[in-house]
């Protein structure tokens, strides 16, 4: 469950290390974002010579949460850290060309197939 002010790791090679959620998109008073939801983030920590810099405001898709994802068979997939993949504000395609760490099968819709194909492991 990601809400405003939540700090997340950037799970791609866009140049951001740490980002903060500033808005949960989709609905007028939506409070929480889960895996597969799009959020608005600001870059809090970035590496030198990256594609993004500190202070940039971008869209991102949540790929891992500590809360986890409940599957229809009753199992829950949980992670140690909250993580997201940064997206282009207009096209909503990933900024980075590599994804680090596993992603969940819940991202396998038409919008995020690029992220699933780049990920080293799909749980």
Curated annotation (Swiss-Prot):
UniProt-recorded Gene Ontology molecular function terms: large ribosomal subunit rRNA binding; structural constituent of ribosome
Disulfide bonds: none
InterPro entries: Ribosomal_uL14 (IPR000218), Ribosomal_uL14_bac-type (IPR005745), Ribosomal_uL14_CS (IPR019972), Ribosomal_uL14_sf (IPR036853)
Domain of life: Bacteria
Keyword Nucleus tagged: no
Gene3D superfamilies for the chain: Ribosomal protein L14
GO cellular component terms attached to this protein's record: cytosolic large ribosomal subunit
Keywords annotated in UniProt: Ribonucleoprotein, Ribosomal protein, RNA-binding, rRNA-binding
GO biological processes: translation
Pfam families, sorted: Ribosomal_L14 (PF00238)
NCBIfam families with a match to the protein in the record: rplN_bact (TIGR01067)
Function: Binds to 23S rRNA. Forms part of two intersubunit bridges in the 70S ribosome.
Family: Belongs to the universal ribosomal protein uL14 family.
Subunit structure: Part of the 50S ribosomal subunit. Forms a cluster with proteins L3 and L19. In the 70S ribosome, L14 and L19 interact and together make contacts with the 16S rRNA in bridges B5 and B8.
PANTHER family: 50S/60S RIBOSOMAL PROTEIN L14/L23 (PTHR11761), LARGE RIBOSOMAL SUBUNIT PROTEIN UL14M (PTHR11761:SF3)
Stated name of the protein: Large ribosomal subunit protein uL14
């Amino acid at each position: 469950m990601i809400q405003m002010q939540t700090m997340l790791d950037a799970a791609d090679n866009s140049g951001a290390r740490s980002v903060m959620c500033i808005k949960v998109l989709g609905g007028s008073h939506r409070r929480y974002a889960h895996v597969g939801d799009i959020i608005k983030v600001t870059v809090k920590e970035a590496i030198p010579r990256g594609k993004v810099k500190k202070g940039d405001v971008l869209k991102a898709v949540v790929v891992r949460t500590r809360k986890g994802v409940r599957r229809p068979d009753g199992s829950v997939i949980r992670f140690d850290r909250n993580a997201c993949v940064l997206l282009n504000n207009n096209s909503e395609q990933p900024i980075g060309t590599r994804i680090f760490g596993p992603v969940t099968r819940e991202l396998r819709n038409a919008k995020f197939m690029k992220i699933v194909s780049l990920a080293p492991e799909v749980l």
